[in-house]
Amino acid sequence: MNVNHNDNRPMTEEEEDRLPVLLPVLADIDGAGKTLFIGNAVAANDAALLLNNGITSTMNLAVNIEMPPLALGDGSVVRRTHIGLIDGPGNIAHHLLGAVLVLHGIINQQSPGKAHYPPHRAGNVLVHCRGGRSRSAGTIALYLHLARPERFPDFEDVLLHVRSCRGLDETQPQPAMLDLCRQALAIWNRSAENGQVLLR
């Protein structure tokens, strides 16, 4: 949790949401050196910050926020993906599972380049929503548990890892998001071959 240096108290969410938040969650997420980051919408729109951290793809999970195109200082363009989840009740587990599968695609997508595509290069990946506390944290935790079970065999343990990386307490992700994660996990575990074929 960030601290307000004027009076040494924890920042409110509103105060934190005015500042860029960008934190690594797992290095070498793809076996080829990419790092997965968690952050907020302010960070996702900060070209210098993204360039300095090697981030070339962002995934926006906020249903109510549209991110504009963004060029980096090296001439490449950030590849944007948007899967809009509601911040609280109202989502279904299949939508969250869709976000997990799309994140897997973003992480492993190649960037061969075409003449009619904006210039892009492979790089690190940022998952964000408005504040990067609930939707992003829950989606990343579920993704790591499903895609990297050898590293994160237990969902509750990976949740602690993501909370630690982001500086969250037990109130985040929100209860509705945690319930959604557990519903999605139950659906995944009922599917053929426990769904593992989808993330290989």
Locations of the language-model features?
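Extended interaction regions within the primary functional domain
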Residues: 2-5, 81, 111, 181-185, ...
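Charged C-terminal helix
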Residues: 170-200
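A phosphate-binding catalytic loop at a beta-strand-loop-alpha-helix junction
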Residues: 117-142
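N-terminal glycine-/charge-rich "phosphate-binding" loop or analogous flexible N-terminal tail
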Residues: 1-21
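Cysteine-based protein phosphatase catalytic domain of the PTP/DSP
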Residues: 18-124, 145-180
